[in-house]
Amino acid sequence: MEKILAINAGSSTLKWQLFEMPSETVIAKGMIDRLGLSDSVFTAKYGDNQKFKEVQDVTTHEMAATLLLTRLKELGIVSHLDEITGVGHRVVGGGEAFSDSMVINPVALDEINRLAEYAPLHNPTQAYYIKIFTALLPGVPQVAVFDTSFYSTLAPENYLYSIPQEYYQKYGARKYGAHGTSHRYVAHRAAEILETPLESQKMITLHLGSGASITAVQDGHAVDTSMGFTPLAGITMGTRSGDIDASLVAFLAKKLEITMPEMIDILNQKSGLLGISELSPDMRDLEETADTRPQSALALSIFVNRVVKYVGSYVALMNGIDTLVFTAGSGENGSELRADICKQLACFGVKLDEEKNNVRSQERIISADDSKVKVLIVPTNEELMIARDVMRLK
């Protein structure tokens, strides 16, 4: 038995899970929230439903990593740190340099830092944690698991933009996608549930959370995805606009007398469901107020509309569909949302079982027995995918 630590680091949070492998048992999990502030919160769940929480100053990433390893020992989750035989790190941007997860060496770490211009909010922090854990756990393999590597199989006609090709050749201006680790996990898990090889299925996976993306999977690999050069592209999201005419971006920046970075910030932080509803980016708030607020109902309709358009285009791209998979917050818990989406996909043979659909975040098949397309709920588990990659590569 081996213990693998999965790290999902952001600028102000450090999420973690410790797995016993190869049984894939979660030994402990938790997070450090509000990093960089005087009231940072460390939480852990472990053992027989034991919980631990403390508030203290965690002002640097070094302090966060040290605190995590210290608490793992003090809480008796591990007796010695040398029980940890591998650490896996989520890294958002792998560009074209990384087509698979990788055991990190100094050259690879430099490349992750070089790719920071493609994921400026994530790569620098995630690369720094790799460096920190390498120092704190000497000799323990550090594996980077890239959000983008699942999309290394896209064909040029699906990842290139219709712009002068020198911009792609010089600057890497192309679709990279995001949420790849989530889509990869749910695609493989859905195939296991159906007891049908992924390689023989035409599958569409819907990651519908505050950030939302759709991926088409054929012959066992991704063939297209809704997010683009950045996670701003694709369907309407909680606060992100999704696809938008580039000329409108310049037009609004001029009208508002703001800079382009300020305009992009509006598209990332103040648009999507929040922008349309003028109330909330949370699907639950919109569903609760849809009967009394036309803007809430409109936001929900636009979201469903964008999802259906992408699914329809991917069905055409693959010349059919066998399996539709819902995951992430709204995808796992939104029975009404799933019903609204599937109702508009009836032309493809999608039919839900109403009773099976009325569950929250439980892994199951929810399509009717006579549905031509299998529809599933598969709660995502990026950390487990990370742990599996560590075991495969270390």
Please give the residue ranges for each predicted region.
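Adenine-nucleotide phosphate-binding core of ATP-dependent small-molecule kinases
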Residues: 265, 272-276, 283-317
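Short glycine-rich, Thr/Ser-proximal phosphate-binding strand/loop in the N-terminal lobe
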Residues: 4, 13-58, 228
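Glycine-rich phosphate-binding loop of actin/hexokinase-like ATP-binding domains
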Residues: 152-253
